[in-house]
Amino acid sequence: MNIIEQIEKEEIARLTANKTIPAFAPGDTVIVNVNVVEGNRKRVQAYEGVVIAKRNRGLNSSFIVRKISSGEGVERTFQLYSPLIAGIEVKRRGDVRRAKLYYLRERSGKSARIKEKLVMKAKPAAVAAE
């Protein structure tokens, strides 16, 4: 491991010390709580939408969230380890077969829907043996 990788790993550990980042993937509906500073006031703003892309590059990791606001599509790019992000909450898991969902930009309404990923729960060993 070279010096740059070591420094990036330490920086990621420092930035994630007080917050947890859940595992999410493209197709998931997430709520990103963003710290917004307006003058001398600081507040948390929730931004909810579908993750259409995720870029895993260590400290430079980012993701794009798309939502429909007043009939217009709005996309916002977030840095995963940014101090402006107060928290990320996964609201719904999406079942998609692509890593980048840029095709959703041309779609609207029912054709832009994403199937929900259903997680099968493992049966206890006692029930499975019978």
From Swiss-Prot:
One of its GO terms (molecular function) is structural constituent of ribosome. Gene3D superfamilies: 2.30.30.790. Keywords: Ribonucleoprotein, Ribosomal protein. One of its GO terms (cellular component) is cytosolic large ribosomal subunit. Disulfide bonds: none annotated. PROSITE patterns: RIBOSOMAL_L19. One of its GO terms (biological process) is translation. InterPro entries: Ribosomal_bL19, Ribosomal_bL19_CS, Ribosomal_bL19_sf, Translation_prot_SH3-like_sf. This protein is located at the 30S-50S ribosomal subunit interface and may play a role in the structure and function of the aminoacyl-tRNA binding site. Belongs to the bacterial ribosomal protein bL19 family. This is Large ribosomal subunit protein bL19.
